[in-house]
Amino acid sequence: LLYQHKMRPHLTRAQILVFYFATYQGEGQHWNTSPKNIYSKPIKVSLDSSNPSPISIKITEEIPPIDPVKDSKYVKHIKIKSELLSEFWGRDMYLQANVLIPEGFDKDSKTEYPLMVFHGHFPKTIGGFRTTPPTAPKEDTLFSDRFGITGYKYIQEKEAYDFYKQWTSKNFPRFLVIEIQHQNPYYDDSYAVNSANLGPYGDAITYELIPYVEAMFNGIGEGWGRFLYGGSTGGWEAMAVQTFYPDEYNGAFAACPDPIDFRAYMTINIYEDDNAYYYDSQFQKIPRPAHRDYLGHVDASQYDYKFEIHAWTLLGG
């Protein structure tokens, strides 16, 4: 972690080579939704091993431009040029933020608000917040494999509407929420720390983007008035940012974070363990668990994951 954050005094991207990467077009660096990428229409083919013949696929389609998300009363979308990142990359680089503003916000008021920073992968806009009642049917035939239920879309919409009602209620605390868009030429987020490979994203977010948002929406603008949270990759980012900028933030809630320490990378100590797939044993080979089901039962081992990851890599994942 420390190695990733503390950039070595190497050359910047602007000083090394000329890199050609697709620029951000509103898709969060997702190739399958990136405007101007081309693709074919789906076709049905028959495979006959006794009579093999070439299959003709015509590239006729192009992904259209993405319309910017419109601001609303409560949700705003901010974009700034980062001088720190632009210097590192040798071209104009930008950071964006989705901002949820509190009920009763008045720019001309002297009221100042604390800031909640939600970390994670690319968010197109503030999710889980809607100002209208749910329109999805309570009962449908769409089964959610993840949660084992139907009607999940209704549940999502209802929770989002309930959050709106809570957010605007009389006694609910007033604060700002920010989601950061820090997609880059390599991925849909930067992991929110400084990196010799990606540049000073940690500094750019902490010292350029967040103060800009706070100035625009009457934030407190001091470390004691900022809190970090996130899950999975966002959990890792929340903990990393709090670790590297202890005076700029006042706490972090890291839910199910990506591995924080390579001494406990899932069930492997990368630094010391000789075998990633089995525990050391004098008697029999004991597989290292890799995944448990909702009851806590092991349903996949590290060895099982080896084949899954290998296949995924071959597919270009």
Feature locations, PLM:
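Non-catalytic cap/lid and distal C-terminal segments of serine-dependent acyl enzymes
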Residues: 1-317
